[in-house]
Amino acid sequence: SSDLVSKNQIVWGANHFISRMPYDSACWLLFDKKVSEEVSFAQYEMAWTSLNGTCKKFDYRWSGMLQENMKNKEVRIHETQKPIALYDWIFSKYATEGMKILDTHLGSGSSRISAQKNKLNFVGFEIDKDHFNNQNKRYENFVSQLTLF
């Protein structure tokens, strides 16, 4: 169809609005934050995909002060921020170098940083100016670290 902007889609949080997804999918992504069921927030995050295949799970401790990679701990700048490692995992499975990536809910910019690391062409949108500025500062800091070496 000529009105499509992408060949495939990955939509985080789609379990909250599944009736609005265009069709059923067998290939969901599950982000297991490796936290206790006693926490007040979700233990897992789910993404609907348009991809062919089976459900896949990414395990990575992501709980406020506790993170999988404490040596390279990420500063939290967004309420629904996901770890860069999650996007590294997604891109390693579903993208190839030079592929175009569109993120319509840029948030903290983790997807943007991962796209840069994985040599992907990236376009991102964020409606909230403060969130956009915060992720842009985070991204510029990441890129400046690359030029040091």
Language-model segment annotations:
Residues 3-149:
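Class I S-adenosyl-L-methionine
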